[in-house]
């Protein structure tokens, strides 16, 4: 049957990467995998039109992907990339309306079975495709209720106020946004990007929204690191050095153990305050700062590391966590967001949200356990191969197609 994908934002909905297994484009990966099962009519922003049209003829499923472009200005594109720039939503709303008008024209000319609002994953701007007289699918959607404020203790005043304001606005929008309500009501199915989003849809809209994290991976064969059986325990931390990522928790957890044989490798932009913290805690010799490095170099570090230490408390489903699993790397993280759903007890260890100090203690306890039980570490690494298949793009696409079939069977 024909299915119609409608997606955004600029760049990420359309950006083709030469190596799909390391692509940053969530929507592109959805498209190339769904196109193995469906005929896709795709509306997207046009910055990477040349790259899209160059690669389509090289893909076996490319003949099933029909692109329509709704470009925006360079100014709006910059706003899209500048996360936190709320001005973007004004332009995004206009883009969604134009997309709706384009969709109306396509429906007249093409046989369309399903309309799918795929991207962006945020719930705040549901677009207008639900107004079309076609079965409507929305998601995966990120509708987390709020940022965990217990972790604001060490935040700067500006960040503290911004996050509390955002929590308040999120609550208001979940309760009162009429277009969100209309989109949910019209949808034949809404998929949740995380367990927290599932809870929000149940609480505010009284629907069951099946869990389907928004990103996937491409399983690969990686030799398991033999150094896991002895010697130093090498932890890898990768991320943007901002407040959400909570790097201080990782540094303090290492200091809490007072074990010089536990090393923390840190990949991310320069921030002297974090290096200063390591000095104050007398663990500078245990922290290896790699700075900003290439994606390939990150993969090399993952293949050498023993544990991927992910301390973020506010995410969608971070691709870097799936990359860790792809490298047979055990993950320690919070049981929250998409990474909490992606990591199960076979491939990692999760701790609950609590307070910063309790989290430091919990992380330290788990790391010490793994330091002393290398057999557990090795077994979890071996288990990653099965989890790769479960989280693969191929499996994600099949789950979505199953939902399409269910929707059409009810028409």
Regions from the PLM with identified roles:
Residues 25, 233, 240-256:
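A conserved mid-protein helix/loop that constitutes part of the nucleotide-sugar donor-binding site
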Residues 59, 275-296:
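Nucleotide-activated donor-binding/catalytic signature segment of Leloir-type glycosyltransferases, i.e.
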Residues 65-69, 138, 169-224:
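Donor nucleotide-sugar binding/catalytic pocket of nucleotide-sugar-dependent glycosyltransferases
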Residues 184, 292-293, 300-305:
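Short alpha-helical donor nucleotide-sugar binding micro-motif in glycosyltransferases
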Residues 238, 263-276, 291:
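Glycosyltransferase donor-sugar binding loop
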Residues 313:
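Aromatic "clamp/platform" in nucleotide-sugar-dependent glycosyltransferases that forms part
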Residues 321, 330-333:
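Short hydrophobic beta-strand element within catalytic cores of glycosyltransferases
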């Amino acid at each position: 049957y024909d299915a119609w994908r409608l997606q955004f934002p600029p760049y990420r909905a359309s950006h083709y990467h030469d190596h799909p297994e390391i692509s940053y484009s969530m929507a592109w990966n959805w498209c190339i995998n769904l196109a193995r099962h469906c005929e896709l009519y795709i509306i997207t922003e046009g910055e990477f039109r040349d790259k899209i049209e160059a690669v389509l003829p090289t893909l076996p499923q490319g003949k099933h992907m029909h692109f329509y472009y709704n470009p925006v200005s360079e100014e709006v594109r910059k706003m899209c990339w500048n996360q936190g720039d709320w001005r973007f939503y004004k332009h995004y709303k206009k883009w969604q309306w134009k997309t709706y008008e384009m969709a109306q024209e396509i429906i007249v000319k093409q046989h369309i079975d399903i309309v799918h609002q795929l991207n962006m994953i945020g719930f705040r701007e549901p677009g207008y495709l639900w107004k079309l007289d076609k079965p409507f699918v929305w998601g995966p959607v990120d509708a987390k209720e709020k940022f965990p404020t217990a972790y604001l203790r060490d935040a700067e005043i500006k960040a503290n106020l911004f996050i509390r304001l955002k929590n308040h606005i999120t609550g208001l929008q979940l309760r009162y946004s009429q277009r969100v309500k209309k989109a949910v009501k019209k949808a034949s199915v809404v998929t949740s990007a995380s367990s927290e989003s599932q809870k929000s849809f149940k609480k505010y809209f009284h629907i069951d929204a099946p869990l389907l994290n928004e990103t996937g991976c491409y399983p690969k064969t990686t030799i398991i690191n033999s150094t896991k059986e002895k010697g130093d325990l090498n932890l890898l931390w990768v991320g943007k050095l901002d407040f959400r990522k909570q790097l201080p928790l990782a540094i303090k957890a290492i200091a809490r153990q007072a074990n010089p044989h536990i090393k923390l490798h840190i990949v991310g932009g320069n921030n002297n305050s974090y290096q200063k913290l390591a000095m104050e805690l007398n663990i500078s010799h245990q922290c290896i700062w790699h700075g900003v490095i290439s994606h390939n170099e990150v993969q090399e570090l993952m293949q050498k590391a023993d544990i991927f230490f992910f301390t973020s408390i506010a995410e969608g489903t971070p691709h870097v966590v799936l990359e860790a699993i792809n490298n047979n790397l055990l993950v320690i993280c919070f049981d929250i967001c998409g990474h909490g759903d992606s990591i199960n007890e076979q491939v990692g260890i999760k701790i609950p949200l609590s307070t910063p100090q309790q989290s430091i203690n919990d992380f330290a306890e788990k790391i010490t356990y793994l330091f002393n039980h290398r057999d557990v570490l090795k077994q979890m690494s071996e288990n990653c191969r099965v989890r790769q298949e479960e989280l693969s793009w191929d499996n994600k696409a099949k789950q979505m197609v199953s939902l399409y079939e269910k929707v059409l069977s009810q028409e």
